Design a protein with these regions (language model features):
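Conserved, non-catalytic sequence blocks in retroelement Pol enzymes and Pol-derived host proteins
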Residues: 22-29, 46-54, 81-82, 119, ...
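Basic/polar low-complexity segments
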Residues: 2-23, 46-165, 454-463, 596-629
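Catalytic palm active-site di-aspartate
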Residues: 184, 223-226, 242, 276, ...
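Short, conserved micro-motifs composed of acidic
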Residues: 160, 421, 436-474
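Short linear motifs embedded in intrinsically disordered, charge-biased segments
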Residues: 113, 117, 543-675
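Conserved pre-catalytic core of RNA-dependent polymerases
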Residues: 131, 160-370, 407
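Basic, alpha-helical interaction scaffolds
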Residues: 1-2, 392, 467-536
Length: 675
């Protein structure tokens, strides 16, 4: 409060009405010229003399040219300053295209038990009650379990205790605070915390260390401001909103200090499951999907059927049981003093919901990891860390709460039996850990050859908790649409649709921006659509690859403002682009470098082996990797096969580049990689 008092004294908040300028490029000189132009137009209309019309047309053209010039300059600077910020770039594109995409955060009405209401006070209280009670209500609906959480835990022999933090650690975090984050209920902006960091770091360091020593997390830091954000469907339904929690900036600095220590301990002792790819260094959606597709292709190469269950957990982050979480933290080696701190961190958390400017009263949150926090995601990973231990016949892959479970067998009868057995085991684990499965959103898909898929009977059904899991022919996982034949047709359809829309936007704004800005838009909005997990679906068919390349050529024509009479190869040369196929090859090479030089998950490292395994590891990066021997074309489509082929084709000097940045630089300089 003392810090806030100083802020209020020297930088008091002042209310100011902000009127958005509809045309900020219209300067005073242009406005004066517009007035003169309009006067001449009025005269010409009144007299209808050809001389008056001629006198009007010349200044009209001058004004229009000047407006176009200043508008172009305005957007050029705007796009340049917002490079790497897709949201801001899209906002500007929508302005130029006159598309009404205003995201109104106001909520007109919601349905309550007493009927529909438009009162901000009632709506804020209703949302707050809904968000704080949803976890408890889901837990109350769960049936009793025959097992307990500890039945699935494996022994741990390491220990962890929070140490006191140094002034250097605190100062570093304060100086790196992002200044664009919303302000919490303590009303202390991140920007002011960052600016005053040299003067407050020592005091904050003492406060943080007092918290660690005493095992008490300050109560004032445990209250969140929650803003309901509409997701989709009806706007008056509570369950169509997600809560955005805003916490104190200073509390998040404290959390980051603790997070760094805990994450280092878990990583050093390899306590986090190898199946988990969410919120972890060197892990990503791409690595998780590569691991999955590698297994699916390998199974198909052996003549096996794959069954994949895409599990949907109901409000998983909101339903974490605090008692079980603390016991699991103890199991993973946290000392009593450290456990006391985490208990204080979780206990007595409150939140207030803000709707249309009205802030609700505070309500206590009894379960779940703190939303919007630094520690919340890591605590969730610890909570579900032992999930893989419940499965006997299947391989799970987790990205936070996004989970898929793969089972394989040559026999459909055995496969169904194995899947159903493991789903029973999964249900036991969920009940023991007081988590709920959303059966209606959980999907099951067989992935196999056409011949094998045709032999699967409709009677080969999968069940969980006596409820049938819906079988699908395609499913979206981690932003990628996966189909039962791994043809990638549906995913390419989705990418093509998004790219076409983005190119349309680029074409409409092109006349207002220069070539450099157009390239910035391409790099921010279009190229990422082609790049996202591209090495996962790189086994796409020739016609699909051609379809994507044509779209990229269209984007190049829009940037260069050239027609179809100009060859695509000339446009790519002008822009310094390679083909998308070469770009995917480049991305695959970079991923292989990360794997072989230790910057990737264990599950990918173990897929690759050097031909001469007798030499010292640090001397054989330049040697070739062992190329798997496929029985069918399926294994040839896998990353374990194509990745080896790409790496082995690289020059020795390039494979010897230890630094990833040096590797990328040298890779780009090769004639076959022009990007």
């Amino acid at each position: 409060m003392m810090f806030l008092g100083v802020i209020n004294k020297h930088a008091p908040l002042k209310k100011k009405r902000i009127r958005n300028k509809k045309s900020p490029w219209l300067n005073a000189g242009i406005k004066r010229s517009m007035i003169e132009r309009d006067k001449l137009k009025s005269t010409a209309i009144r007299t209808n003399f050809s001389e008056d019309w001629s006198n009007y047309k010349k200044p009209k053209n001058r004004v229009n040219n000047k407006i176009k010039e200043t508008k172009t300059q305005y957007y050029k600077e705007h796009f340049r300053s917002n490079s790497g910020k897709p949201r801001e770039i899209w906002k500007s594109i929508n302005e130029v295209m006159s598309r009404n995409t205003k995201n109104d955060s106001n909520i007109n009405s919601i349905k309550t038990n007493a009927g529909s209401t438009t009162s901000p006070e009632v709506m804020s209280e209703t949302f707050n009650k809904y968000f704080t009670e949803i976890g408890d209500k889901l837990a109350d609906k769960l049936p009793d379990s025959t097992k307990i959480y500890s039945d699935f835990l494996l022994p741990v022999n390491s220990t962890f205790q929070l140490r006191q933090v140094s002034l250097a650690e605190v100062l570093k975090l304060l100086k790196n605070l992002p200044t664009n984050k919303a302000t919490g209920l303590d009303k202390i902006p991140c920007r002011l915390v960052k600016l005053s960091s040299p003067f407050i770091a020592d005091s904050l360091c003492n406060i943080f260390n007092m918290s660690i020593i005493s095992g008490i997390f300050p109560l004032e830091w445990k209250v969140a401001k929650v803003i309901p954000i509409h997701k989709d469907n009806e706007k008056d339904e509570l369950n169509n909103y997600r809560p955005i929690s805003i916490l104190s900036a200073i509390s998040k600095v404290m959390e980051r200090l603790v997070y760094n220590q805990l994450y280092e301990y878990l990583s050093k002792n390899e306590l986090l499951s190898k199946c988990q790819s969410g919120f972890r260094h060197s892990h990503s959606t791409t690595t998780s999907l590569l691991d999955a597709t590698n297994e699916w292709y390998a199974n198909m190469d052996q003549g096996n059927l794959n069954s994949v269950v895409f599990v949907d957990l109901s409000k998983a982050f909101d339903t974490v049981n605090h008692s079980i979480l603390l016991k699991k933290l103890s199991h993973y080696g946290l000392h009593a003093e450290t456990l006391k701190w985490f208990n204080s961190y979780l206990a007595e958390r409150r939140q207030q919901s803000l709707v249309n400017g009205y802030l609700s009263s505070a309500k206590t949150i009894k379960c779940g990891v703190p939303q919007g926090s630094i520690l919340g995601p890591l605590l969730f990973l610890i909570y579900i860390n032992d999930l893989p231990n419940c499965l006997k016949h299947s391989n799970p892959r987790m990205f936070a709460d996004d989970t898929n479970i793969t089972t394989s067998s040559k026999s459909i009868t055995k496969l169904v039996q194995f899947v159903n057995t493991d789903l029973d085991n999964l249900n036991d684990w969920l009940l023991a850990n007081k988590l709920s499965l959303n059966v209606t959103k959980t999907e099951q898909m067989y992935i196999a050859s056409d011949n094998s898929l045709n032999k699967i009977s409709d009677l080969a059904t999968i069940h969980l908790a006596n409820k049938q899991i819906r079988r699908v022919k395609k499913s979206k996982s981690l932003g990628i649409t996966i189909d039962e034949r791994l043809s990638w047709t549906d995913h390419i359809d989705m990418v093509s649709k998004k790219v076409s829309s983005a190119i349309g936007g680029l074409r409409q704004v092109r006349s207002f921006i220069n070539k450099e800005t157009a390239i910035t838009i391409y790099n921010s909005l279009i190229q990422p659509l082609f790049d996202y997990c591209d090495i996962v679906w790189d086994s796409l068919g020739a016609s699909q690859a051609k379809r994507l390349q044509k779209l990229n050529n269209r984007a190049g024509r829009a940037i260069c403002q050239l027609g179809y009479e100009v060859r695509s190869s000339l446009i790519r040369s002008q822009l310094g682009w390679s083909t998308l196929e070469d770009r995917r090859r480049k991305n695959k090479s970079i991923t292989m470098h990360k794997i072989l030089y230790g910057n990737s998950p264990t599950y990918l490292k173990q897929c690759f082996h050097y031909a001469n395994s007798g030499r010292e590891y640090n001397l054989r990066r330049s040697e070739n990797l062992i190329l798997p021997k496929p029985k069918t074309e399926y294994l040839r489509k896998s990353f374990t096969f194509s990745g080896v082929k790409v790496w082995n084709s690289l020059p020795v000097y390039l494979k010897n580049q230890v630094s990833l940045s040096s590797f990328k630089r040298e890779l780009t300089s090769l004639s076959s990689y022009n990007y």
